[in-house]
Amino acid sequence: MILFGSTGSIGVNALKLAALKNIPISALACGDNIALLNEQIARFKPKFVSIKDSKNKHLVKHDRVFIGQEGLEQILTECQDKLLLNAIVGFAGLKSTLKAKELGKNIALANKESLVVAGSFLKGAKFLPVDSEHAALKFLLEGKKNIAKLYITASGGAFYRYKIKDLNQVSVKDALKHPNWNMGAKITIDSATMANKLFEIIEAYHLYDFKEIDALIEPRSLVHAMCEFKNGASTAYFSKADMKLAISDAIFEKQDTPILEAVDFSKMPALKFHPISTKKYPIFKLKNTFLKEPNLGVIINAANEVGVYNFLENKSGFLDIAKCIFKALDHFGVPKISSIEEVFEYDFKTREYLRS
């Protein structure tokens, strides 16, 4: 397996699972966490390693260290492994997804942004979903027909129990306290704004070619997806909130190993489902428009990344993230995109506009 994003939450869990099944790791790539990368190199002995910045190359305990986006593409070309787990955060993961598709590799995709910004250019790719909701949908949809609607669930994020008027005052520390999941900073903020759920709906659309998709808040994160059929029946996928289950579905050839303790239905608390309030989560207003106009993805994602990192760096408030997205959409409208190069151009233009 080739693992990009090895020092993040998904990468660390994937390596625990790889060790469980003795899956060889041929390549590791990370951003700046060189100390953890060196531990992983010592444990898994990859043939190839890549890091984001050449200034850290001398710190890496490996004799084949590649650098940046070019380094990732070189690894994909040279390494013969057929499986890439792409757990790079954000738009930065797109080039690796495109290259892996070009090379015919199986792509265990944690980098949902690839589909959010360039789903129409990734048709035919061999995707294995890593998000818990999409792994759940894959299970629910297998061999099924006459589907009326799909649902994925959201926890509501760190501020689910907050009043709208209190969101003006929240800190980065507050926003990073996810009630159910242990994840990286970027996705934890995206969960708090509901941008993550918006992106997951678009991801599901591209993965399963189905537009009747919605999301509901299920605060305990025990139900991950539901499938409603035309005859009125519905099915649901239950599991505890742990990413290792979805990762194992993507990287294991056989699902014959206990990964999590099963949900004990006799002890399970009462479950409640709630619609997502667009007053509290204004980003979610974009769901229907986004499904009609998937080209909006590159604008929404770039603006979201600018807004989130401004917030994480204490340059702006939590509510400014949504304002950043709507400002960019007002400026650019629906982009006409006919080539992958234009996706990169609009990403650049959006970031430049918001920083000017």
Swiss-Prot record:
Pathway: Isoprenoid biosynthesis; isopentenyl diphosphate biosynthesis via DXP pathway; isopentenyl diphosphate from 1-deoxy-D-xylulose 5-phosphate: step 1/6. Mn(2+) binds at residues 131, 133, 200. Its cofactor is Mg(2+); Mn(2+). SUPFAM superfamilies: 1-deoxy-D-xylulose-5-phosphate reductoisomerase, C-terminal domain, Glyceraldehyde-3-phosphate dehydrogenase-like, C-terminal domain, NAD(P)-binding Rossmann-fold domains. Pfam families: DXP_redisom_C, DXP_reductoisom, DXPR_C. 1-deoxy-D-xylulose 5-phosphate binds at residues 112, 132-133, 155, 178, 191, 196-197, 200. Its EC number is 1.1.1.267. Keywords: Isoprene biosynthesis, Manganese, Metal-binding, NADP, Oxidoreductase. InterPro entries: DXP_reductoisomerase, DXP_reductoisomerase_C, DXP_reductoisomerase_N, DXPR_C, DXPR_C_sf, NAD(P)-bd_dom_sf. It is an enzyme of class 1 (oxidoreductase). It comes from the Bacteria. GO terms for molecular function: 1-deoxy-D-xylulose-5-phosphate reductoisomerase activity; manganese ion binding; NADPH binding. It catalyses: 2-C-methyl-D-erythritol 4-phosphate + NADP(+) = 1-deoxy-D-xylulose 5-phosphate + NADPH + H(+). Catalyzes the NADPH-dependent rearrangement and reduction of 1-deoxy-D-xylulose-5-phosphate (DXP) to 2-C-methyl-D-erythritol 4-phosphate (MEP). Belongs to the DXR family. PANTHER family: 1-DEOXY-D-XYLULOSE 5-PHOSPHATE REDUCTOISOMERASE, 1-DEOXY-D-XYLULOSE 5-PHOSPHATE REDUCTOISOMERASE, CHLOROPLASTIC. This is 1-deoxy-D-xylulose 5-phosphate reductoisomerase. It comes from Campylobacter jejuni subsp. jejuni serotype O:2 (strain ATCC 700819 / NCTC 11168).
